[in-house]
Amino acid sequence: MTIKNINADLEERLNEIKDDVINHMNKDHAEANLTYVRALAGMPDATSARITDFDQFRVSLTAETLNGSSNVQVQFLEPLEKSEDIRPALIKLLKHARTRG
């Protein structure tokens, strides 16, 4: 199996869980999303944030401020190697964000 095949397989597995992860994070962890954009995306005045997408390298969010919304991306500290890595990667990213914010 080539690197390209491995990445395609991971992308497929991430797509299978993507909706559930995004819905869960936006419903149950809105404060974590806000911490990501405030501390790691350079938007300290953000009032809310929601995840819109993710891949093995980054999470994409829409951040709201009093001046409107912005789409931002925050890199994971390490690329995901398997779909099961998403939860620990988001937790690790949150812990990192808290040390920066």
Please identify what each model-predicted range represents.
Residues 1-101:
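Binding-site signature for planar aromatic cofactors or substrates
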